[in-house]
Amino acid sequence: MIESQRHSYHLVDPSPWPISGSLGALATTVGGVMYMHSFQGGATLLSLGLIFILYTMFVWWRDVLRESTLEGHHTKVVQLGPRYGSISFIVSEVMFLFAFFRASSHSSLAPTVEIGGIWPPKGIGVLDPREIPFLNTPILLSSGAAVTWAHHAILAGKEKRAVYALVATVSLALVFTGFQGMEYYQAPFTISDSIYGSTFFLATGFHGFHVIIGTLFLIICGIRQYLGQMTKEHHVGFEAAAWYWHFVDVVRLFPFVSIYWWGGI
């Protein structure tokens, strides 16, 4: 008897990846605690847990791409789930970064007597916001314009143009990351140099980490676009990457104003 599906939802097949991801998370957590408390085998368990999680992420997303690209299970109704999930994830990341910027603002607006009652603290050599920070900001904002160009190209059915736009986006992202690394290397202070160093590296480093994740996301989208796996009707993965990237480039304005400019002028 042939089974027929009379709805637009995707009933997924049994998968081992949820339980494998859970086991990887368990191993990572236990291994991390053991490593921090100098228990024997903690580093090994932590490494195995991280490898297990990365492997699970790879094969799980591979299966999702197969279900959408080759099997056609991602109808318009199914596509709403990843869209809502991506928006919820980005909102949670906004809250995360807001906490770091709030910590920096709190310390700068009400400096304590332990740091001399001034901001930046006495003895801290700060970075000039008119140099690399000022250069890096328009670079990242330009990458946001490039990813919008790629989106319009996909909607217009211009596959090659979309690939070129994604290459431009990734190139600008790599330039930004390179300058960020140069900035860290040349910084006259470290993360342990008072509350200024702690909030600076925590906030800008967390944002830089998001840039790296977004760059990997866009590289995968560029490869899929080159292989012809995205169309103007089916490109939810790219939409999620574009939304994430716009979040990353807009957020850049906050550390530039609240950390580089406020703490460096």
Swiss-Prot record:
Tell me where in or outside the cell this protein is found: Mitochondrion inner membrane
Q: What is its main location?
A: mitochondrion
Which InterPro entries does this UniProt record tie to the protein?
Answer: Cyt_c/ubiquinol_Oxase_su3, Cyt_c_oxase_su3_dom, Cyt_c_oxidase-like_su3, Cyt_c_oxidase_su3-like_sf, Cyt_c_oxidase_su3_a-hlx
Q: What is its EC number?
A: 7.1.1.9
| Classification via Gene3D superfamilies | 1.10.287.70, Cytochrome c oxidase, subunit III, four-helix bundle
Pfam families (alphabetical): COX3
Q: Which domain of life is it from?
A: Eukaryota
> What parts of the sequence cross the membrane?
16-36, 41-61, 81-101, 137-157, 162-182, 200-220, 245-265
Q: Which GO terms describe its molecular function?
A: cytochrome-c oxidase activity
What does the record give as the function of this protein? Component of the cytochrome c oxidase, the last enzyme in the mitochondrial electron transport chain which drives oxidative phosphorylation. The respiratory chain contains 3 multisubunit complexes succinate dehydrogenase (complex II, CII), ubiquinol-cytochrome c oxidoreductase (cytochrome b-c1 complex, complex III, CIII) and cytochrome c oxidase (complex IV, CIV), that cooperate to transfer electrons derived from NADH and succinate to molecular oxygen, creating an electrochemical gradient over the inner membrane that drives transmembrane transport and the ATP synthase.
Q: Which family does it belong to?
A: Belongs to the cytochrome c oxidase subunit 3 family.
Assembly description: Component of the cytochrome c oxidase (complex IV, CIV), a multisubunit enzyme composed of a catalytic core of 3 subunits and several supernumerary subunits. The complex exists as a monomer or a dimer and forms supercomplexes (SCs) in the inner mitochondrial membrane with ubiquinol-cytochrome c oxidoreductase (cytochrome b-c1 complex, complex III, CIII).
Q: What is this protein called?
A: Cytochrome c oxidase subunit 3
According to its UniProt entry, this protein's organism is Vicia faba
